[in-house]
Amino acid sequence: MAAKEVKFGDSARKKMLVGVNVLADAVKATLGPKGRNVVLDKSFGAPTITKDGVSVAKEIELKDKFENMGAQLVKDVASKANDAAGDGTTTATVLAQAIVNEGLKAVAAGMNPMDLKRGIDKATVAIVAQLKELAKPCADTKAIAQVGTISANSDESIGQIIAEAMEKVGKEGVITVEEGSGLENELSVVEGMQFDRGYLSPYFVNKPDTMAAELDSPLLLLVDKKISNIREMLPVLEAVAKAGRPLLIVAEDVEGEALATLVVNNMRGIVKVAAVKAPGFGDRRKAMLQDIAILTGGTVISEEVGLSLEGATLEHLGNAKRVVINKENTTIIDGAGVQADIEARVLQIRKQIEETTSDYDREKLQERLAKLAGGVAVIKVGAATEVEMKEKKARVEDALHATRAAVEEGVVPGGGVALVRALQAIEGLKGDNEEQNVGIALLRRAVEAPLRQIVANAGDEPSVVVDKVKQGSGNYGFNAATGVYGDMIEMGILDPAKVTRSALQAAASIGGLMITTEAMVAEIVEDKPAMGGMPDMGGMGGMGGMM
């Protein structure tokens, strides 16, 4: 085990504070409408340019182990805020820096760190409750666009496209962000249920110009196993041929003789048919087949429930208005399922989303929910260069998280004003002793930090602006983009309540822990001696005759 270095008291806290300030100073330069960019060096390829707080924080690693601990703890604040609300990372970092700086001053003056922390915690609970009261529901497209615009660093086109996407696919819908190929942002919406499985044979294609197989008013056969024997399928194929309707087969796989027979029947025009693999794997595949069955009013042919392929009839088949299959995707449009069954399935999936602890499972369940209840929208980000594209894509993703948070918990006035207004919650708040009162007062000052930083980044005098905003009431605040005072909500400067709340909670939690630090332990870095040079090879005698 390597030897460790231990620092105590003030010397430990001073080192930690250096790390906190280095990281926070780099991150806070990006805050507000006039925040600057940060350039991040990459070991390969072009540098990344970003205004995203958490991206900057993740890149910072300091040489001194003790300073680095401070930096890593603040990085954790940004990550926590990002995980909770998907945005507000810079605000959280600025708040944490203010809490730690104010707190360590009080500790140096001889205050008890544990009581300071209790005071901070008390004040945080009161401010969070006040923020929830200040929040107004965010339902209309205009408010959603404004939230998206602010989060995307005042880029109106991004706010607009996100609001449009949300309007089209609803609150339950899935919105994904991809890199586009043009200069402009594009929005495409997939109607119906789409899953990432294409046709099993190109011979099913009946639209050569788009290389797609389109089936109008098809029947759907859903099978939870591999089909390789055509004999099992003959009864259902004959029934479909008599009905004179196209057939889509969704199975674990269709191979060998069964696939060849389907292709021949399709080419001869006996039965218009197409086959695709079922989406997902394992238990998720079963669940998705069941989703398709409920959406189309069919039944999954599975031996688990005592149904065999030979015994399948037209009653077991699902119905849809149209199915489009290309090389990669299958889209089922207007399934004929019973609305009450679909709603019951949606409720069941929502319950699973609440109960799951895995982020991956939650994401997959959300996708299933969107396919049943809403739809899927894809925002393709356009830019002139790859560097700009990456920076813009990160902003679109941030804005998307912010708008989702706004729909969830409502909006508050932006520009750091909500936190200043929430201070009224701790006007008469008293702790159990004088030191807790100092903790409450300390948070009162720290909460002004985001507004001060936004103003400083815009080149104005923070103290003057904070004083004027405090004299106002309600939504009155300072628009740093234009330098005008007024009603923040009317000016379209909104923040999601969830983002502001998560930022404060993350900052107070980790800031409080840092104040109460008394000792720090780190490994001693040993300077390894340089490697010795190569030994002398001596003369290459005896080679003279080779000329």
Curated annotation (Swiss-Prot):
The keyword GTP-binding does not apply. SUPFAM superfamilies: GroEL apical domain-like, GroEL equatorial domain-like, GroEL-intermediate domain like. It is found in: Cytoplasm. One of its GO terms (molecular function) is ATP-dependent protein folding chaperone. Keywords: ATP-binding, Chaperone, Cytoplasm, Isomerase, Nucleotide-binding. GO terms for biological process: protein refolding. Belongs to the chaperonin (HSP60) family. Forms a cylinder of 14 subunits composed of two heptameric rings stacked back-to-back. Interacts with the co-chaperonin GroES. Together with its co-chaperonin GroES, plays an essential role in assisting protein folding. The GroEL-GroES system forms a nano-cage that allows encapsulation of the non-native substrate proteins and provides a physical environment optimized to promote and accelerate protein folding. This is Chaperonin GroEL. It comes from Pseudomonas paraeruginosa (strain DSM 24068 / PA7). The lineage of its organism: Bacteria, Pseudomonadati, Pseudomonadota, Gammaproteobacteria, Pseudomonadales.
